[in-house]
Amino acid sequence: MTQDTSTYYVWIGGSCDYGHKERAGGAAVVIEHNGNIISRDVISDLHTTEFRMMQTLMLKVMQEIPEGSDILFLTNAAYIQNFDKTPTAKSAESRGRKARANPDLIIQCIEEKKRHNSVGVKIVQYHKSPLLIETHDRATEAMAKTRKEFHQKNNRLSVSSEIVASVSMPPCAQEGEDGTENSSHLSR
């Protein structure tokens, strides 16, 4: 692909682990300008999807790139092509589905797009785009890290709760050496 030196090319990919109950989602970008990689970014969160994370990161990129710029997002996720289409009940009906997901982010993207000369999305082939592959790999790593930190934090909280419960247990509720409840202090 021949690049225009004035355009910001933003490779964007995402990942989500639908198989886990805490469902982590992540997105990453690699930004090229004037033939050079100028920035990389990655985000992740729990109880979300890769699409929400990708739209969140699109919004962040549009906010950070200088006003009046030309921005082209390059991805294999057709979902984000509608980042600037106002969600309506009629658009949902015509597709026989519920209303478009993430309307809050779409509205913000529409507003942020106004700051720039042009903002578009181009679908590219995943296996032919090393920088797109990188974004998916980085999004997957960030998502896995977020999930791991969540479980480590919950395990620490669980252990802390058990320690507090055993330390604060009144003597009458503690067991004696023979396994029966020790209530000798009550008979005094």
Where in the sequence are the language-model features?
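RNase H-like nuclease fold core
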Residues: 1-52, 63-64, 137, 145-147, ...
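RNase H catalytic domain
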Residues: 15-21, 41, 58-136
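Glycine-rich, flexible loop segments associated with nucleotide phosphate handling
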Residues: 24-25, 99-100, 160
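Low-complexity, flexible helical/coil segments
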Residues: 44-50, 67-68, 107-112, 155-163
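Short, charged, low-complexity patches
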Residues: 50-55, 102
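Stable alpha-helical structural segments in soluble proteins, enriched in small hydrophobic residues
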Residues: 53, 57, 131-143, 149
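Acidic, His- and aromatic-enriched active-site or binding-groove loops in soluble protein domains
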Residues: 102, 141-164
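Amphipathic alpha-helical surface "interface" segments used
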Residues: 128-133, 156-169
